[in-house]
Amino acid sequence: MSATVRSAVVALASVLAALPAAADGWSPAPEPAVWVQTRQQLQASGAMTDRPWQFMEALETPELMAGEYLSGRTRTSAGVEFDAGLLLRRNGVEDWQVRELRMRALCNQQRLQRLAGDNQWVDYVGRDDTASKVAWICDIP
């Protein structure tokens, strides 16, 4: 795994671990205006893939701003595959970091995996609310 991918995974896991656990029946909140503007600017600049992104949640502290997005849910024999996007900016740094990862939800197992550089699926760091989020991800109309 490259250092860039490793640092993105660690950053995303840290952000997500800091977010409060969701209750059963979790669903994403509407995308706040500040995140709409940030995402649109990053898409327009080419830093983030220009496609429809579903806002999942965000963390805003004095040290860090991080937003989590999901796009392109597709049902597969293993569950649901999707693209995950992380927008990250640390205090004192003007530029945003954008990380996009291919992921999948293993619906029956209530867990997430990410596609590693060697095209192998590896378990994604879990949190208390992973099962609720997997249930939402797997609920494709």
Question: How would you label these PLM feature ranges?
Answer:
Residues 23-141:
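N-terminal secretory-pathway/extracellular module detecting exported/lumenal segments
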Residues 18-22:
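N-terminal signal peptide c-region/cleavage motif recognized by signal peptidases
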Residues 1-9:
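Bacterial N-terminal signal peptides that target proteins for export
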